């Protein structure tokens, strides 16, 4: 965790796994019915990584789950209930095998992920230009 994070509802923020970094001045807003989960899968052949830049906003109910790699640029915002993952988490035909297809996710600077948005594997969202 970088310098000066703002965490509203600290007991509802769940960070689990290895290789997780969040830049300076991140804001996490949580609530009893909408926890924020930042999770990596580090087992078998997978060594998940999550890297978030500076000034990111994580709203209630946000989930970010990585089996490979999720890179989040500076000043990105995640609205209520957004879910970003780099994996399908299991195959269609053999659901007993963990993880399944997993490809890197990259969110460039100033990307906003809207309310209840869900995205899996190989997303690349380009920087939002305010001009």
What do the predicted segments below correspond to?
Residues 1-85, 105-110, 116-119:
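Domain-scale signature associated with acetyltransferase and cell-envelope carbohydrate enzymes
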Residues 121-128:
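Conserved small/polar residues in nucleotide/adenosyl-binding loops
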Residues 131:
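Gly/Pro- and small hydrophobic-enriched strand-loop and loop-to-helix capping segments
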């Amino acid at each position: 965790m970088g310098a000066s994070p703002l965490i509203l509802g600290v007991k509802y923020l769940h960070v689990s796994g290895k290789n997780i970094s969040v830049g300076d001045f991140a804001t996490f807003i949580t609530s009893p019915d909408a926890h924020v989960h930042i999770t990596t899968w580090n087992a078998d052949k997978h060594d998940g990584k999550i890297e978030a830049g500076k000034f990111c906003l994580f709203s209630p109910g946000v989930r970010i789950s990585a089996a490979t790699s999720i890179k989040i640029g500076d000043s990105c915002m995640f609205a209520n209930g957004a879910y970003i993952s780099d994996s399908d988490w299991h195959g269609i035909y053999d659901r007993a095998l963990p993880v399944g297809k997993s490809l890197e996710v990259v969110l460039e600077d100033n990307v906003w992920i809207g309310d209840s948005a869900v995205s899996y594997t190989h997303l690349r969202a380009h920087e939002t230009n305010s001009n």
